[in-house]
Amino acid sequence: KKYNKDPFHIQHALTVEAVMKWYASELGYGEDAEYWGIVGLLHDIDFELYPEEHCLKAPEMLRKAGVGEDVIHSVVSHGYGITVGCGATIDVAPEHEMEKVLFAADELTGLIWAAALMRPSKSTKDMELKSLKKKYKSKGFAAGCSREVIERGAEQLGWELQKLLTMTLQAMADCEDEIKSEMDAEE
């Protein structure tokens, strides 16, 4: 909250944190789940203060806070290959599986929440993969969520897109109550 105050950005950070912890457990990195979660929580630390320099200001901010270079690399790598508003292209590539999951799931969590908000339940818990895929294919839906980045992320992981969609939807459904209770506590 010190750096991102918009409730949407806070919810996004909490969502990515929870999804990253879920993935850590699912992929056999359970002992590192907290670490994966911290990277997810911090990944957009510079977004509100420096939207035109997203991923470029994060290292300085995180170093000032005493965060290690491993976390900084992971945070910056979620923007790999993306040209930000100031014209710079992020050149720090995701290397570890955790960084590749973050790269792939970041944009996708936004698209899944947007799809959930269109549902009568406003929930991911009752969302079927078929419904998500339909929204995903509609380029005008949640247009700010880059399908290209999501697809590149699946490719980096060596996964079919359907696997990424299925797993991230399941992660969000499993974590939804936790995310909502954290958001309620923020109010």
Task: Indicate residue ranges for each PLM-predicted region.
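Metal-centered catalytic cores of metalloenzymes
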Residues: 1-7, 18, 24, 80, ...
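C-terminal binding/interaction regions
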Residues: 124, 129-184
